[in-house]
């Protein structure tokens, strides 16, 4: 073990004593391997008290700014991964740094409210400015949560509560329901299920793993509910050259949804909710068409099933809209839309018909984080003030064009270029080649990441401009040539 003074010295070297960065570097700057010696030393220390198996490198957050992340060894990388798609305005945006120094945020940090019982006096105003102002069409009610997984988990609980109330003619639980549930018996503990999709990712809690099918390592050794998993479209690209094939994908997947609803009903295990991502991000950036989602909405309406759209990774503007489902033109809005990541706090919007009447059924100590809500309020203001959604559309259109050109010149190393806005991906022939590319790109100063079995994904922030795009593709081209 390092002596206490030596450990403090190492951390002090990394953190430095300078103020928070307030400008981007002129470009990437790499002086060591990544992870470098300081990152490796910090990881060794961390490993003595905490798991480190997923740690890539330690970050100097004081020196990181805008679209650039700086690691413990001083390497500056252009970041198109942005904390797994969770930084709306990049690193240390001045407007957010200013909010972080305000008394109302400090008091929420020091005396963290248990929001379900003791909310701040200005909590409703914060909800209105940060969340209601960007609410999905047709949904105004919102419930904050800690993260995307807890948002999805509690959205499903809400769906179950509503579904059972409908069975009781709109009434709450009676004495028999309350007594039997304590022994996990009917009618208080019903047989109900939630439908997910092949390739989906909705979180790693016990409940959400039952609707997650992206990577085996997430699920192995963990008990799961007997819930249906339906097929999700697997399109061929370019879309305009594969219309018939992709249309058949939609039809086959919708037929599978109908078949599994019927099958689980025969098992006395009704499908109470269907949860779906607009883009299966963790699973490999798989897309569904508006026609597919329209069909899915019509099926849920026909069967009285709650339709939950998981926008944890897609929400926040990277697709060119705050909500990726905005362009679906549904016959009626989703019943619920979950969010987190770029929207800084977790939670879900829901239709008024789903409001839970009884206290403590949707509840935990924190029920979200008011400090994140305060930051989101300012982030939304900046997004509107600076026209960042419009910028995302413009830069995103160019990004899609350039990604297609990169694929065409790759000599077969890339295929299936796809995306919406700056939310984009491209495939490699194998996962091992993709992983080799990611490591080489990082050594060249571009921080990117993988998803699915063999996909490379791009998740830049909303302050990502044409200048950053040009540099991104210079680095991608350099990396591809060195592969």
Swiss-Prot record:
InterPro entries in the cross-refs: 4NH2But_aminotransferase_euk, Aminotrans_3, Aminotrans_3_PPA_site, PyrdxlP-dep_Trfase, PyrdxlP-dep_Trfase_major, PyrdxlP-dep_Trfase_small
One Gene Ontology term, aspect cellular component: mitochondrion
Protein's cellular compartments: Mitochondrion matrix
Keyword Ligase in record: no
GO molecular function, one term: pyridoxal phosphate binding
Requisite cofactors: pyridoxal 5'-phosphate
Chemical reaction(s) catalysed: 4-aminobutanoate + 2-oxoglutarate = succinate semialdehyde + L-glutamate; (S)-3-amino-2-methylpropanoate + 2-oxoglutarate = 2-methyl-3-oxopropanoate + L-glutamate
Any one biological process term the GO annotation gives: gamma-aminobutyric acid catabolic process
N6-(pyridoxal phosphate)lysine modification, residue list: 341
Lineage top rank: taxon: Eukaryota
Keyword Protein biosynthesis: no
Positions with a binding annotation for pyridoxal 5'-phosphate: 148-149, 365
Entry's EC annotation: 2.6.1.19, 2.6.1.22
Residue positions binding substrate: 204
Main location: mitochondrion
Principal EC category: transferase
UniProt keywords, alphabetically: Aminotransferase, Mitochondrion, Neurotransmitter degradation, Pyridoxal phosphate, Transferase, Transit peptide
Family according to the record: Belongs to the class-III pyridoxal-phosphate-dependent aminotransferase family.
Subunit structure: Homodimer.
Name of the protein in its database record: Probable 4-aminobutyrate aminotransferase, mitochondrial
Organism: Caenorhabditis elegans
